[in-house]
A protein has these predicted regions:
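Juxtamembrane helix-loop-helix connectors linking adjacent transmembrane helices
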Residues: 11, 15-19, 44-112
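Short, membrane-exposed interhelical loops at transmembrane-helix boundaries
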Residues: 196-216, 250-278
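Function-critical hydrophobic alpha-helical transmembrane segments in multi-pass membrane proteins
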Residues: 65-69, 88-151, 156
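Functionally important transmembrane alpha-helices
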Residues: 150-215
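Hydrophobic alpha-helical transmembrane segments
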Residues: 95-112, 208-228
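Membrane-helix interface linkers and caps
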Residues: 12, 16-61, 230-267
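Final/C-terminal transmembrane alpha-helix of multipass membrane proteins
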Residues: 276-297
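Conserved small/polar residues in nucleotide/adenosyl-binding loops
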Residues: 1-5
């Protein structure tokens, strides 16, 4: 999941991935720099930059494999109605040096998108209920990709990653999962293109209705088993902040006490002194600037 470069400029002599790297940095860095200033907060608070446990790291990596079938299923469903432009982007990446592709498709989106959408944007929703904050965060993340084909799975992942930030009080688990998810897509595409280069030179894979139906059924079957795994992995995250016990805790550890180590954790809930609202002027300005960057680059 990376936001596609919409530039109308032509740098024919420049590697496409280098141009993508420059475009993404030009788009993301100003927003990251002004985000904390807009909310008058410490950058550590705005971006939710807090240490996580080794268990959270392992759970974040495992979560990548668990959500894979669901993201693939949602991507297939939307590709029935909209062209899959991501395959074209991955075909372009196949022609570029591997390290450029990793930086452009995996590292920059994982770091910058999480800082902006699960940092600046999500922290702006602290006066909403957790459910509203996560859903709105997912909607904005989906819209920001400007790609209908990616809309369903980016929304689902956006909601999930927002909830993970709430549980762990950190953007790092989301960054790890985001990187692993994009990296797995990149590796899968490179292997596929290398095996069937003649059929995928233009980034388009010919898929019959029967083959599409077969893939949908396969991923639907896998998704049924993935959902409880996802719920369990997420429930293991953020336990040091008292974000609830892991699933099946009563069966596995009936006598274990879970202590809240940080009493200052700020829950996403309407505060009495503030009116609950989806947007304030700072967040609206951030989104306007973001859209302008997308259109101008």
């Amino acid at each position: 999941m990376c936001i596609r470069d919409r530039s109308v400029l032509d740098y024919s002599s420049m590697d496409p991935m280098i141009y993508s790297i420059i475009g993404q940095l030009a788009m993301f860095l100003p927003l990251i720099l002004i985000g904390p200033k807009m909310f008058y907060e410490n950058p550590k608070t705005t971006f939710s930059i807090y240490k996580i446990s080794v268990g959270d790291v392992i759970a974040a990596i495992a979560l990548t494999f668990a959500i894979g079938p669901i993201t693939s299923l949602l991507s297939l469903i939307t590709s029935i109605f909209f062209p899959n432009v991501v395959s074209t982007d991955l075909a372009t990446a196949y022609q570029s040096p591997f390290i450029y592709s990793v930086i452009s498709i995996c590292i920059i989106p994982a770091v910058c998108e999480e800082l902006i959408f699960r940092g600046v944007v999500f922290s702006g929703f602290k006066n909403l209920s957790l459910k509203k904050a996560c859903i709105l965060g997912g909607i904005i993340f989906s819209i920001a990709h400007f790609d209908p084909q990616q809309s369903l799975y980016t929304f689902a992942v956006g909601v999930l990653f927002c909830y993970i930030v709430y549980r762990t009080k950190s953007v790092f688990p989301g960054m790890i999962s985001h990187f692993c998810l994009n990296f797995s897509q990149l590796m899968f595409s490179r292997i596929s293109f290398s095996l069937t280069a003649a059929d995928t030179a233009a980034g388009e894979i010919v898929m019959t209705d029967a083959l599409m139906a077969q893939y949908v059924l396969q991923y639907l079957f896998l998704s049924v088993f993935s959902i409880p795994i996802i719920l369990y992995l997420v429930s293991l995250m953020g336990r040091k902040y008292g974000r609830g016990k892991p699933l099946f805790a009563k069966l596995l550890m009936p006598k274990k006490e879970f202590v809240i180590e940080d009493e200052s954790v700020f829950d996403y809930a309407p505060q009495q002194q503030y009116e609950e609202k989806f947007f304030d002027w700072q967040l609206i300005l951030i989104l306007i600037l973001y859209i302008l960057f997308i259109l101008l680059l």
